[in-house]
Amino acid sequence: MTVVEADGHYVEPFAVKNLFIYSGETYSVLIKADQNPSRNYWIQSSVVSRQPKTAPGLGILNYYPNNPRRPPPSATPLAGPAWDDVNSQLAQSLLTKARKGDKYHRPPPRSADRVIVLLNTQNKVDGYYRWSVNNVSLNHPKTPYLIALKHNLTREFDQTLPPDGYDFKNYDIYVKQNNTNGTTSSGIYRLKFNSTVDVILQNANTMTVSNSETHPWHLHGHDFWVLGHGHGKFDIYKDPLKYNLVDPIEKNTVAVHRYGWTAIRFVADNPGTWAFHCHVESHFYMGMGVVFEEGIERVGDLPTSIMGCGATKGLRLP
């Protein structure tokens, strides 16, 4: 099959036998129906990045008017890539680029005004496992950020700014860390309106020996350019020199692979508060996410119909 679109943007077409799709992503593919029309063919979906505990999902590709109940020639479909085949997963990510000549493609800004590095970790907080970013696990406040910021309800969330990075030099991403002292926070990143922001997603070992999981990160309110992917620890001096600034794909969800890194760039030009989080829902609710604020002063009056949570319960504002 040939991949032609990802997250609403045309890609330079490339052919694959297996397509890796992570939670929150969308793809369009073309399949050329040029095989023997008297046969049926297997379609299979499998879990990757975490050892599966369930059987693969199966379907049948049928040529009309061939009987769809006729089984394919083989009793079972061919096996796809192994669940932990990170090289194949990374190869697809590197192949996904903007379509040449696409008049809708926007080139990225040549440089960034701010760089934020987000280390994906697993921690224990009060004896419970939590997912974290830079060893800080996001706690969602009862009052929505947008309302709290617009109406200066500063007591409704932590005013301490989250860290822009971690101890790059000394943190070993391949080792199970003693992350039993993780902290929680509802603090947010405050971005200058219309600024260009680079975010480096760095994956690391979990609190299980020799274990790292793929995380699909999704940004609300924006599309971003995917500038690069790589194995191992991101080098803040060398790896930016390898960024793809020619034909990077625009997406809203991107994977950071096991023991790897992913670099994205976006323009903070949409007034409001926007979540950026792992799109594995349980990971987000367990703390793997951040919130960006940009241009809150440009947000118009908020309708009273959205009041009702936290400090806004029963609040009626003109």
Where are these regions (language model features)?
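Histidine- and aromatic-rich segments of cupredoxin/plastocyanin-like copper-binding domains
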Residues: 1-113, 117, 121, 128-140, ...
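Intrinsic, low-complexity N-terminal interaction/targeting segments
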Residues: 1-8, 159, 165-173, 187-188, ...
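Active-site-adjacent structural elements in folded domains
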Residues: 11-15, 181-186, 247-250, 259
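Extracellular/periplasmic metallocenter environments
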Residues: 18-69, 206-209, 213-217, 224, ...
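Intrinsic-disorder/low-complexity, polar/charged segments enriched in Ser/Thr/Lys/Arg/Asp/Glu/Gln
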Residues: 26-28, 113-117, 184-186, 194-198, ...
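N-linked glycosylation sites
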Residues: 135, 152, 178-181, 194, ...
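N-terminal edge beta-strand
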Residues: 164-196, 208
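Asparagine-centered strand-capping/turn motif at beta-strand->loop junctions
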Residues: 200-205
